[in-house]
From Swiss-Prot:
Its EC number is 2.1.1.144. Catalyzes the S-adenosylmethionine monomethyl esterification of trans-aconitate. It catalyses: trans-aconitate + S-adenosyl-L-methionine = (E)-3-(methoxycarbonyl)pent-2-enedioate + S-adenosyl-L-homocysteine. GO terms for biological process: methylation. The gene is tam. Keywords: Cytoplasm, Methyltransferase, S-adenosyl-L-methionine, Transferase. It comes from Pseudomonas paraeruginosa (strain DSM 24068 / PA7) (Pseudomonas aeruginosa (strain PA7)). It is found in: Cytoplasm. Disulfide bonds: none annotated. Its main location: cytoplasm. Belongs to the methyltransferase superfamily. Tam family. This is Trans-aconitate 2-methyltransferase. GO terms for cellular component: cytoplasm.
């Protein structure tokens, strides 16, 4: 049976938890640095950090371009409250990115680990490009987790952890969790190349080495698992966690040094407009 402390940690995931999210801040910062290294802008006037969360990327953007007008945008009041404590010059806006529009054209739209939550990239990305100034840049990285082992194990638990091996949650939840918002690399190119002067697209797998008794769960519960943990009632959540934690421990055993290997794939996109 899953431990009581895990039930408490997973109890209500309808809100973002800044403290839990920052548990792996160094590892979450790594793809941001990789993405920034591919952004070729000398002195952007106006930067929007989309899905800024606690400001991990916002702070790096402020360091690189201290003179830029910097805006952090996120849907979570809890995350924005944490980000506002950073010692940087930035404004903070609470908004749903599905409907958000920049007040003024952006030199850089920076989206770290957020666009994979939004559907219909074939219309989303052109809409974001339309909010750039001439020569502006859209830079994004997205976890490509639909084929990851921990995600497939989550789907397995959702489909079979109910009484007698029945599914948990609503059919709508199970359908949504099976959807794939992130496109293939070649489809991103076909979408963006006709609209841009330059497009740089790549995929990276980082072998993340994580600490703790349940590090894979601690990582995914604050992001990918939020819809599941937010919908399931207490009994269904208990059944789900019993099954899912057991599967994770079997598939991701601790190494001899007590740490856990957590391979993680991400797609990177840098799309620049003509001047």
């Amino acid at each position: 049976m899953v431990r009581d402390d895990l039930r408490c940690r997973a109890g209500n995931e309808t809100h973002w938890d800044p403290t839990a999210y920052m548990q792996f801040a160094r590892l979450r910062q790594r793809p941001v640095v990789e993405l920034l290294d591919h952004v070729d802008l000398y002195s952007p006037e106006r930067i929007y950090d989309l899905g800024c969360g606690t400001g991990i990327a916002t702070e790096l953007l402020a360091r690189r371009w201290p003179q830029a007008e910097l805006h952090g945008v996120d849907s979570s009041a809890e995350m924005l409250e944490e980000a506002a404590r950073l010692p940087i010059r930035a404004s903070w806006e609470r908004a749903n990115l599905q409907h958000w529009c920049a007040e003024r054209p952006a030199s850089l739209l920076f989206a770290a680990a957020v666009l994979h939550f939004i559907e219909r990239h074939c219309s989303l990305l052109p809409r974001l490009l339309g909010q750039l100034s001439p020569g502006g840049c859209l830079a994004a990285h997205m976890p490509n987790w639909r084929d990851a082992s921990w995600y497939r194990l989550m789907l397995d638990a959702l489909d079979s952890a109910g009484p007698g091996g029945t599914p948990l949650g609503s059919p709508t939840l199970r359908y949504l969790m099976q959807q794939r918002n992130v496109l293939s690399l070649d489809n991103y190119y076909r979408l963006l190349a006709p609209l841009c002067a330059e497009v740089d697209i790549w995929e990276t797998e980082h072998l993340q080495v994580v600490d703790g008794n349940d590090p894979i769960f601690d990582w995914v519960k604050v992001s990918a698992l939020r819809p599941v943990l937010g919908e399931l009632d207490e009994e269904a959540r208990r059944r789900f966690l019993d099954r899912y934690l057991d599967l994770l421990h079997r598939y991701y055993p601790q190494e001899l040094d007590g740490r856990t290997l957590f391979p993680f794939r991400r797609v990177f996109v840098v799309a620049s407009l003509r001047r």
